[in-house]
Design a protein with these regions (language model features):
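Structural motif corresponding to the C-terminal cap of alpha-helices
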Residues: 37-41, 118, 169, 173
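Flexible, membrane-associating and regulatory peripheral segments of lipid-active enzymes
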Residues: 1-18
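Active-site gating loop/helix substructures
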Residues: 87, 93, 100, 125-186
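Patatin-like phospholipase
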Residues: 15-19, 25-114, 149-154, 158-165
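A broadly tuned preference for mixed-charge, low-complexity surface segments
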Residues: 103-117, 176-187
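Solvent-exposed loop/turn segments at secondary-structure junctions
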Residues: 22-25, 137-139
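Surface-exposed acidic, glycine-flexible loop patches that form ligand/cofactor-binding
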Residues: 7-10, 41-46, 115-130
C-alpha cells in the first residue's frame, strides 16, 4: 500500500480544518447543522475542508464524512443509532444495580449500528483526510488515528473505521473500552 499523493490545499493556500466535538446524541445536531449548511449554501461540506477532525460522537460524524456520506446521509442512520443504542430503559442507571459495575450501554449494539453505516471500510478507504483521537488506557496517552495523508502517516490505514468509531466513542461508564490492535482505548 502506498498512501495517496498529498492533496493540494483548497484555493487561497490556507489549510482548512473542520473540528467536530462529541456529546453523544448531541452530535445529531451537528449533522443536522452541516446538512442545512450544505442545503442553504449549495456546497459540499467535505469538499470545503482539507482535514476533518472529530472526537467521540463528532468522530462518528467525521468517519461518516470520510466514508463518502454527505451530512444529510448521516442524519437518518444517526437518528436510528440513537434510538437503538440509547434505549429509554437504560437512561436511568441508578435504577439498575448492575450498571454500577458495568457500562450503561451495550457496545455490541453500538458496533452493529456503526457497521450498518460504515460497512467494512478501513481508514485507508477514507475520501477525506481524517484525524480521530482516543485515549490509550495502558500507556496513559492520547492515541490519534490518522489517514495516510502524509508519507510518514501509514500506521492506521488498515484499521476498520468501525473499530476507530468504537474507540473514539468508548466513553467510560457508558460503553466498554475498545480493543484495537491490542490496545485498550477509550473516549
Amino acid at each position: 500500500y502506498f498512501p495517496p499523493p498529498r492533496a493540494r490545499l483548497l484555493p487561497g493556500g490556507r489549510f482548512q480544518i473542520l473540528a467536530l466535538d462529541g456529546g453523544g446524541a448531541k452530535a445529531l445536531f451537528t449533522a443536522h447543522v452541516l446538512a442545512r449548511l450544505e442545503q442553504d449554501l449549495g456546497i459540499s461540506i467535505s469538499n470545503s475542508f482539507d482535514l476533518i477532525a472529530g472526537t467521540s460522537a463528532g468522530g462518528l460524524v467525521a468517519l461518516g464524512l470520510g466514508a463518502g456520506l454527505t451530512p444529510g446521509e448521516i442524519v437518518s442512520p444517526y437518528e436510528a443509532l440513537v434510538k437503538t443504542v440509547f434505549p429509554v430503559s437504560r437512561r436511568r442507571p441508578w435504577r439498575r444495580p448492575r450498571q454500577l459495575t458495568a457500562p450503561i450501554y451495550d457496545g455490541d449494539v453500538l458496533r452493529s449500528a456503526l457497521t450498518e453505516v460504515l460497512g467494512d471500510r478501513t481508514l485507508g478507504d477514507s475520501t477525506k483526510r481524517l484525524v480521530i483521537p482516543s485515549w490509550d488506557v495502558q500507556r496513559g496517552a492520547v492515541h490519534i488515528f490518522k489517514t495516510p495523508h502524509h508519507i510518514r502517516l501509514t500506521r492506521d490505514w488498515r484499521i476498520p473505521m468501525v473499530d476507530i468509531a468504537m474507540a473514539t466513542s468508548a466513553a467510560p461508564i457508558y460503553f466498554p473500552a475498545a480493543r484495537v490492535d491490542g490496545q485498550r482505548l477509550i473516549d
